[in-house]
Amino acid sequence: MQIAFNTYIKNDICWLINGISPDVLKEMFDAIHENRNCEVVRSGYYKRILRYTHDRESFYIKRYTVRNGLESVKSIFSLSKARREWNCAHKLLGSQLLTATPVAVGEKRRFGMLKDCYIISKAIPNSTTVKELLIAFRQSSVHALKKNTLLNNLISYVKMVHDHGIFHGELHTENMLTDVDNITLFYLLDLGRTVFKK
């Protein structure tokens, strides 16, 4: 896996990229600011998530905004939320565990203090959250064996993650995806609070 620093800077955001070209990043970032080709997944004051599609490949873009001056000062001495999530995703992938592949992380700082940060990850095709799958199973006449298989796979997966010394911090069924055709494959999402004990 080759990581390359990108010299593309717009609006004082410095980007680290892996897996997309600077041209695609520029196009994506321009689209974000012009609100085109983007679907708003979640929009809060401090966190915004967009889905962007480029050449039939989808990406999720998370933007975190610093809450207050104290958090901005603390950011001089700590990693941004986006950078923590970037690092955790690469550690998970290095441990042969699945997550959304991060392709870019960007930070906007002034005098070393963080203003906002971004992480861009590839969307996981053919997947659904474990929560959505459990709701679908409950509302349909899915055979009990399939339900039990999913639950047993999920329990085994969570045990395996913990056996690797990985503690998610926000482990719940909305932060886990599964492949709709293969319910033995799970992906962890929202890794910002993940701790690696081993």
Regions found by a protein language model. Give the residues of each.
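Juxta-kinase regulatory segment immediately upstream of eukaryotic protein kinase catalytic domains
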Residues: 1-39
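Conserved ATP-binding subdomain of kinase catalytic cores across diverse folds
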Residues: 24-131, 159, 163-164
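Surface-exposed cleft-lining segments at the edges of enzyme active sites
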Residues: 73, 140-146
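AlphaC helix of the protein kinase catalytic domain
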Residues: 129-141
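Catalytic-loop of the protein kinase fold
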Residues: 163-173
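Catalytic activation segment of kinase domains across protein kinase-like and atypical kinase folds
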Residues: 174-198
